[in-house]
């Protein structure tokens, strides 16, 4: 299921762009702010897979990897619990110099309307976690499970 919804958010991180870039392409660093574990091949055409919460994996392929500047990758959820199949949406991360370090600008495209809010909430929680771990602080707690179907911001069964 693809759509035309877009999520855009930003976060200032207290480190230079080259340092922040490493937190997107090193599996241990990435897992420290966005999940539990990760396997990454950060090169155009390379794959990634990471477990965000227990048993829920995201995966995709890198489209662009420009050290210290940007990372673009496809995105999706493997289990089907969230109706965004791997490869059906695209995430672009731009790293811009900022007086306080780096402005991380994230744009997630091609989301269906029913999952836009979930992804907006997720990215708006994960980017502050990134800022915290880069600064050497404990990350802000994140839920350990996805919402139950009745709490989820998408229909639990397909509509007519």
Briefly describe each language-model feature range:
Residues 2, 8-9, 15, 19, ...:
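Short beta-edge strand/loop motif at the mouth of beta-sheet-based domains
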Residues 6, 81-125, 141-143:
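Beta-strand/loop substructures that line and gate deep hydrophobic ligand-binding cavities in soluble
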Residues 11, 59-64, 89-96:
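Hydrophobic/aromatic beta-strand elements that line small-molecule binding cavities or substrate pockets
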Residues 17-18, 63-69, 94-103:
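A short, structured loop/turn motif at beta-sheet edges
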Residues 20, 30, 48, 62, ...:
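Hydrophobic pocket/interface hotspot
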Residues 23-24, 65:
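Conserved catalytic core of Hanks-type protein kinase domains
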Residues 69-76:
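Short, solvent-exposed secondary-structure boundary/capping segments
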Residues 110-160:
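A conserved amphipathic terminal alpha-helix motif
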């Amino acid at each position: 299921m693809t759509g035309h919804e877009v999520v855009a958010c930003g976060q200032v991180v207290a480190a230079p762009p080259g340092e922040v870039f490493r937190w997107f392409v090193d599996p241990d660093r990435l897992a420290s702010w966005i999940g539990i574990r990760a396997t990454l091949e950060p090169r155009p055409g390379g794959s990634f897979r990471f477990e965000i919460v227990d048993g829920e994996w995201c995966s995709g392929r890198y489209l662009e990897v420009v050290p210290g500047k940007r990372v673009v990758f496809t995105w999706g959820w493997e289990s089907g619990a969230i109706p965004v199949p791997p490869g059906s949406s695209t995430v672009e991360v731009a790293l811009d110099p900022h007086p306080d370090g780096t402005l991380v600008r994230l744009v997630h495209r091609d989301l269906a309307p029913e999952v836009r809010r979930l992804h907006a909430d997720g990215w708006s929680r994960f980017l502050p976690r990134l800022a915290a771990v880069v600064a050497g602080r404990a990350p802000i707690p994140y839920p350990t499970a996805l919402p139950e179907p009745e709490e989820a911001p998408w229909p639990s069964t397909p509509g007519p």
